[in-house]
Curated annotation (Swiss-Prot):
It catalyses: GTP + H2O = GDP + phosphate + H(+). The lineage of its organism: Bacteria, Bacillati, Actinomycetota, Actinomycetes, Micrococcales. Belongs to the TRAFAC class translation factor GTPase superfamily. Classic translation factor GTPase family. LepA subfamily. The gene is lepA. GO terms for biological process: positive regulation of translation. InterPro entries: EF-4, EFG_III/V, EFG_V-like, EFTu-like_2, G_TR_CS, LepA_C_sf, LepA_CTD, LepA_IV. NCBIfam families: lepA, small_GTP. This is Elongation factor 4.
Amino acid sequence: MSPMARTAPVPAATDPAIIRNFCIIAHIDHGKSTLADRMLQSTGVVQARDMKAQYLDRMDIERERGITIKSQAVRMPWEVEGVSYALNMIDTPGHVDFTYEVSRSLAACEGAILLVDAAQGIEAQTLANLYLAMENNLTIIPVLNKIDLPAAQPEKYAAELASLIGGDPEDVLRVSGKTGVGVEALLDKIVRDLPAPEGNPDAPARAMIFDSVYDTYRGVVTYVRVVDGMLHPRERIQMMSTRASHELLEIGVSSPEPTPSKGLGVGEVGYLITGVKDVRQSKVGDTVTNLAKPAAQSLPGYADAKPMVFSGLYPLDGADYPVLRDALEKLMLNDAALVYEPETSAALGFGFRVGFLGLLHLEITRERLEREYNLDLISTAPNVEYEVTLEDKKVVRVTNPSEYPTGKIAEVREPMVSATILAPNEFVGAIMELCQSRRGVMGGMDYLSEDRVEIRYRLPLAEIVFDFFDILKSKTRGYGSLDWKADGEQVADLVKVDIMLQGEQVDAFSAITHREKAYAYGVMMTGKLRELIPRQQFEVPIQAAIGSRIIARESIRAIRKDVLAKCYGGDISRKRKLLEKQKEGKKRMKMVGTVEVPQEAFIAALTTDESKDKAKKK
C-alpha cells in the first residue's frame, strides 16, 4: 500500500489528533526548499509533471539567489498504519535579516526538522534557529541532507548534531532532497514523534498570523495557525493589535495551490482573504479573533518589525521620482518591515530615506525596484539610527548624517548587536582581529567539536552593516558564518565628517563615524574624489572636516593655458605681465567659479568596491 493517503482529511472537520504542524530550519543553502519539493512529491500533492525546483519559492529573486524570503505553508496528506494524517509544513526563511518571521513560523508549529548539510555541518544560523525552536519548546527531529554528495561526512556530522541536541548519532535521519532517499522515513517519523496540536475548540477563536502576502487581484492573503476555536467564511474577524475588523471573504488551505474550505479548526494552518489592500492591516505575529465573540487575551510574542539599517535611495533621472514613490508604496504592501520618508539632497535631488531589516533586505528591495519597475537608482552608504542627547537634555534620533545636530552634544548612543560567528578553529585569530578592529568586545568562545568553534562578540551595528560579512567570508575562506541580533544601545564617541568642495559642503558624502576612524574616512573620501572630479580652470581644494576642524585635504590642480606660447624670445617683463594677468584671472575665477560634480563621480564615490565589481560583471 502506498503511504500516500487515499482519503485526505477535510479542513474544518479534522480531528487535532491527526494534525502535525512542523517547519524546516536550516542555514542558507542546506537544501531546505529541495527537501520540501521531495515531500510535496512523496505525498502526491504536486504531480510529477507540474513539479519544478524550489516549488514554493515564487519570487524570481528567491529562485535566482536560491534563498527563501517569504514563508509558505502547505497541507499534505500522509498515511501511517491505515490512518490518514494532515501534515502542515511551514517553509521558513533562513537568513538572519528575517529572524522575526522565522520566530513566528516556529510559534505556529509543534515540531521542527533541524536540517544540516552532510558536507558542511552546522552553521551559525542553524544554531540561532535551533535556539529559537528550543525557546518555543518544539520537538526537534535532526536530519542530515545531501548524503548523495561525494564530500558528505554523515558519521562526523551526525555525532556533532547528536552532541548538540542530546541523543544518539544513530537517531539522526539521513536523507537526500535531490534523490528522495529517506524522505518517506522522515514523513513517518514526523507522524510518530511530533505531538498533536492542543487547543480548546469551544473557546473564542484565536489564530496567529505567521505571514501575509499581497496578491494583485485578491488583496492581502494572510496565513494563520488556529490555536483555539473555529473560523468560518463570512464571519467578521478582528485583529487584536490594531482592533481593525474585516469580513472573511474566503478561508482555506494551501495544498500547495489555494483551496477554499468551510473553515479552519484547532491546530489547522490555512489562509484568510478579507479584501484588505495593505499588509500592515495584518501584521505578522498578530492574533485574529471573532468580532462577535472576541478572545480576552492575544497570543504572546507579537512585536513590531523595526528597521535597523537606513539608506537613501535616489533615482538617477529626477523624472523617475514619482515612479520610485509608487514602486515603494507597492513594495510596502507586501513588506511590513519596510519604512520610507521623502528626503532631498542638494547633490542628488529628490529621493527617499528607506529603513530595512538588514543588508540583505536592502539589497533585495533595491534589486526588486530596479528589476520590476525599471528604475536606475543610487543608494547612499547604509547607516543606522543614532540617539543624540543635547546639553539641554533634548533627544534627537538621527538616521541621516545631514540631520546630525550642530549644537552642544552631551552624548551619542548607537545600537549594538550580539553576534555569533561559527568557523573552523584555524581562523580564530583572523576573526578576533577583525572583530577587535570593529570595536567588538568578546563575549565568549565554545568549541562545538575539535575543529569547529563558536565565537560570541558584542559589536556596534554600524560596524557590521557595511562590509563585515564579506570580509569575514574572505578571512575564513568562505567557511565562516555569522548570525546577529539586536542588543540594546551604548554611548559612543561619534562625530560627523563633512566633505567640502571649495569650502562648500556636499551633503551626500557626509558620514557619522567613530572619532578614531574619522581621519581614515576623510583621507579615503578626499583621495577618491580627487581622482573622480574632472580638473577645472582653477585649483579646487577637497577637504574633510569635523565641525570647523579640517582633518584631511587633497587638491585638484588647475588646468592652465600656455600664455607664453606666442612670445618668441623677447623681454622677460612681457612674459611676467602675461603670467600675472593669467594669475589674476584664475584668482577671480576661483572667487566666483563653482564646481560641478558629475553624476558618475557620485555613483563611483558612493558605491563600495564590491558593488563596482558587480557592475563590471554586468
